[in-house]
């Protein structure tokens, strides 16, 4: 038994597992708020290096009881590229998010001017912390995902061990079952109201 190697391969499998979770979609426990003070004449700003994506962004003006957050429209690269004057300054109304290999940036349009103080307020998806060395530390997952973590790790390790290849299918099924349970519970709860739309037609007699 190669104890040292087993520890390293388990750590790598765990890191790959959490990366897979990020690719599967939104994990509520990774949503983090943040703000960036905007500078007049500067259009592009870098987000924290562990940012996966932005899910909400707004332009904040004022402070205290006079603070106002205005929604910023997220636009695509094609929409941003069609702006005829990308250096036009004014009150930002749109944001173009670039998810690069080493960082995530947001480019605002119009470029912030100096007529008032602007703050970029956002909610981002934070990357799940990986395990680098050793076996100490706290797992960056909530308790409701622990069964999924355990079954997923067992499945990932089994794929590397020929002697247990006959159990891979069963372990994958258990992992998918546990993930569906956890992901189904890890959803946002909010009130919603449906109002029927009625149209009346009248005809002359």
PLM regions and their residue ranges:
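Glycine-enriched, solvent-exposed interface loops adjoining structured elements
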Residues: 1-205
